[in-house]
Each structure stands twice: as structure tokens, then as C-alpha cells.
């Protein structure tokens, strides 16, 4: 089972997105409403990915990304942000974010993120050529 942690103070806004992820084969969605809860969760149950809202109850989402890196740099991170692509790139450069999602991600966004995660996890377990 692939575990995806969604970190947001507003589950209702992301309910359709999360439900679409849950409907994919072998996906489990977990929730945290703040950065501290997310950090504790990641340390206890390392997920395949963490999807982080831009504004959390206790810190900006980008700060959570920075705090997750030393805990487990291999976790795929996705940010929900209304920044322009250029401003987002500038703000997140060097943090290894997998993607940016719009403030109200859709079912289509969920399917695309899952497809990318599947491709990336398949690459990470691929055997080297001899």
C-alpha cells in the first residue's frame, strides 16, 4: 500500500482530490492539519509522498518542506500554491519539490500526481542494466 500524507488545515477543500487518490490502486491517504503533526507522522510512518498546503496552522508550507528534508530527503513533496510558476520556482529552488498544485486541485490533478508518483517509484526500484 502506498501512503500519501496530505497536510492542510482545510480537508473539505481537498476532499475530492483526496478521494480520487484513494480510488487509485494501492493508495492510502493520511491527513495532518499542521506542520508539527506532519513531521511526527513522517517520522513514524514514512509516506511515498507528502502533499502540503501553502498555509498551515503553525508554519508556511514551504517551511515544512525545508524541515522534512533532513528527516527523509527521499520523500516526494508536492506544494499547493497560488504563486505563478516563476515565483514558485524561485521560492522552492533547491528543495526538490516534485510539483506545484493549484489552490483547488481537481480529480485530474490527483490522477496526474499519482501517475507521476508511480513512474518515479518504478524508476527507483528498477534494476540496473548489465
Q: What do the PLM-derived regions correspond to, one by one?
A:
Residues 11-30:
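Two-component/phosphorelay signaling modules centered on CheY-like receiver
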Residues 43-45, 67-74, 95:
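Conserved phosphotransfer cores of two-component systems
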Residues 63, 81-105:
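Alpha4 helix (beta4-alpha4-beta5 surface) of REC/receiver domains from two-component response regulators
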Residues 87, 105-121:
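C-terminal output helix
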